[in-house]
Amino acid sequence: MTMPTDLPLPAPTLTERLIRPLVHGLRHPVVDNLLRLGAVNDTLRGLHPMWSLTEVRAHVLRVEDETADTKTFVLRPNALWRGARPGQHVRVQVELDGRRRSRAYSLSRITPGEVALTIKRQPQGLVSGHLHSQLRAGDVLTISQAQGDFVLPAALPPKLLLSAGSGITPVMALRQQLLDSGYAGDLRFLHISRSRADLIFARRLGGPDVQHHATAVNGRFSTDTLQTWVPDWQERSTWLCGPAALMDAVHGLWASTPAAAPLHSERFGAALRPAQPLGSPVQVRFSRSGAQFSTTGSAPRLLQAEAAGLALKHGCRIGICRACQCTKRSGTVQNLQTGELCSAPDQAIRLCISAARSDLTLDL
């Protein structure tokens, strides 16, 4: 059975029809080289908060409370939005204390003309806290185009959806895609949370395919839980998303069960492997700006650059959104997620999950 992927975009509003010829005219390559797009975007924002040459801006239609610490923000993007597939995410940009900050959030719902972000407020979350306390219906939010490959294939749909905590957000979008397509296969959906009160989308989680396991013991996954609710889990292709503890436990279970059906996953929160401290300092040089700093530590390059007073572009900080990706011209880095070393020149690396193992030159 072929399942729908991209949803149709809505008809543009009168305002968008009027501004679109201007936008496309100004985006001629020659004009791009003459204009500072940032300044033009700022000018257009002053005329209308949804107007931009390059940025997707989204009107906040409504804000829905899901749990005590989770809200859903329903958005209508402007004419630059290219659509999305269930399971993908966007980067949300906000200005705080004079700096533009970016975080990656999954799309929990995609309908013609609207998308929804379901965001849990993190205890120390600068951006999530700002969105929860400040963002209201009628505001305008800057987002990226949809990104990510945690999407359903046209064939071989999943037989098991497994999530915990806020990992339910992309998984819920995948489930809705299946339901909207008329999928009549044998689907099971197991979600784990600390309590019923912590269950995101409680009002939408009816149906015979859904099993909710609430546990007071840290909301942790166990093999017994899976075996109890889904006895034939080994035979089910599985889509998985959740915090690091869930990801590690499930990946460990699948690794010890070679006959298990395929597992597809997206991680919420990076499980970084510690790199060994260096015996002597190494130099990290930025070839374009001329900036440089020395380090003997094993922290990601992004954190060390910020500690040295350098402001670098970044987003999720966990290796997902690739906002901090740059080209390594020379030197060796270690991927703190996989432990792999990369010494080849002119390779793309993500600063938030890369630690220097030698002198480095970065194209920044």
Language model segments and positions:
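Short flanking/linker segments adjacent to small metal-binding domains or redox-active Cys/His motifs
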Residues: D359-L364
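Iron-sulfur (Fe-S) cluster-binding modules
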Residues: M1-S52
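FNR/FR-type flavoprotein reductase catalytic core
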Residues: T2-L14, H130-G290, S294
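Local cysteine-cluster metal-coordination motifs and their immediate loop/turn environment
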Residues: P170, L310-N335, S343-S358
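Short polybasic amphipathic segments
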Residues: V92, V282-S287, C324-C326
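C-terminal accessory/binding modules appended to enzymatic or scaffolding proteins
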Residues: G279-C316
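Hydrophobic structural packing positions in well-ordered secondary structure
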Residues: V60, G87-V90, L107, G138, ...
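Ferredoxin-reductase
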Residues: L44-V140, S144-Q145, P157-P158, G185, ...
